[in-house]
Amino acid sequence: YGFELISVPMTPNGPDMDIVEKLVAEDDTIKGIWCVPQYSNPDGYTYSDETIDRMAKMKTAAPDFKIFWDEAYIVHHLTEEIIETPVLLNESKKYGTENRVFMFTSTSKITFPGAGVSAIACSVDSMKYICKRFSVMIISYDKMNQLRHVRFLKNKEGVLAHMAKHRRRLVPCFDAVKTAFNEELTPCGDIAHWTNPKGGYFISLYVMPGCAKRVAALCKEAGLTLTGAG
């Protein structure tokens, strides 16, 4: 689509904000940043309160800079601990930057992939902008599907109860992978390390430089398909 992606190193608290702040403050051709703030792929990191605050108040050279805030895993907990982060839209209002925020979520990893419902949160001005463009994309949404989701999930408590069922099925899978890593790789020394996420759908395995693609190929030969290795 004619735009360039700039990668920023990740930390356990989110993207390296020193780098983010420097980039967006100095270059007015940088128009936005895409973030998955909770259980972010591939490491399962959750942005800290400080990171979210810095996102909300950072100075940007581009007056039309946007933050695309993808809450893909907002309720995808793998432990009994319910991690909640500050709402970026609320934080941005403290600094008068709410027009830069677009927050997204959906039920694609809750009910039906590709056939769930989605939601957008943004400022009033931004919502007017979006609705004007949505009006030429679709005449009417799938109201029956929306109704099915409301009747099934009902409310926040219903969503969390449903996700607890997902967790009971997923946790044994995560445990099996981590057990295999500990039993097979730990005795070999520093050849690999891996993440222990509290939520999301991924465990990241880090192997020695130059080995990732070969490891993925061997896994595929053994019948285990992994997310593309780099």
Across the structure, where does each feature detected by a protein language model lie?
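Substrate-binding/gating loop at the entrance of the active-site cleft, primarily
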Residues: 1-3
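Conserved C-terminal alpha-helix-loop-beta "cap" of PLP-dependent enzymes
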Residues: 127, 131-132, 137, 202-230
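Short, solvent-exposed loop/turn segments at secondary-structure junctions
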Residues: 13, 38-41, 73-75, 108-111, ...
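Short beta-strand segments
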Residues: 7, 34-37, 68-71, 105, ...
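Conserved glycine-rich beta-strand-loop-beta hairpin in the small C-terminal domain of fold type I
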Residues: 164-178, 190-206
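Active-site phosphate-binding strand-loop segment of PLP-dependent enzymes
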Residues: 12-83
